[in-house]
Amino acid sequence: MLIRTETLLHKTLAHWREWSFVSDNAPKKQPQVIAQLTGGLTNQSFLVGKGEFKAVVRVNSLDSDSFVIDRDRETLFLNLLQSTGCVPKLLYANSDTQVTQFLEGRCLTDNDLANLSLRTEVEGSLKKIQAIRLGNMPRRNYLKYSRSYSDQLSDFSDFSDLEAIERAAMTIDEGDWQPVISHHDLLFENIVYNDQGVYLIDWEYAALGHPLIDYLRVFGPKYCISKADAGTVEALVVLQLGLTKLWYAVKGNNKSVRDIK
């Protein structure tokens, strides 16, 4: 564990009385680290607890700026979405760390979408989230956003399709659509479900975005084709795949870039 990570983790735990406890199982003493959670590509997260209380402490990456992450916006969105019951309860957040409710359950899989009841529940969660409105925040400019990544790269040898990504971004930017709160990284690993419902986690890439961008990630282009014209759906597909490639390139994982189809 890096010294920075260890320092921030223990500092956050030491200030546990500042957390916003929302249930009867609030700890009487400082929570302790139970285990480091694996699987995340950006940050380092830890399961902590005391007695029946459990939470997740996330230590934010130092590369937040490189990955175009706005931590203040993430916190704003999570606070706004608490009433939907579709996101983990936010207990504490600052620029370096975040503490959220630990959710028992498992992540969604592709096979789960064959379950009509669960599929409908995921759709319902997205509808609840998109129904929450913001005032004066501008919608995401996808061309500017894509260039925030590509401008960091000096070698485009793996990006012969960079022009296609930017054309797709411009197509979406020039479209007539109403922005909604969009997760923008809605991998199955970021959808947890249990007997209480479906929860969307890890909101660090969220912004006001295109209303189909999250549906596309979860349900695929065939689902979206009945909700927009073919040109828009095609542009969203190219854009989403392109942004994923750019993200991996900035991270420096060239193998991952080549393996994305």
Task: Show the residue positions of the predicted features.
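Active-site Asp-x-Gly
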Residues: 180-181, 194-243
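An alpha-helical support segment within catalytic cores of ATP-dependent transferases
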Residues: 9-28, 131-184, 188-195
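Conserved N-terminal boundary motif of the eukaryotic protein kinase catalytic domain
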Residues: 27-35
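ATP-binding pocket architecture of kinase catalytic cores
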Residues: 36-139, 159
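Acidic active-site catalytic centers that drive phospho-/nucleotidyl reactions
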Residues: 58, 74, 183-185, 190, ...
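ATP/Mg2+ or Mg2+-diphosphate-binding catalytic cores
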Residues: 159-163, 247-261
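Conserved protein kinase catalytic core
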Residues: 64, 107, 191, 208-210
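A general structural signal marking secondary-structure boundaries and capping sites
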Residues: 85, 126-134, 172-173, 222, ...
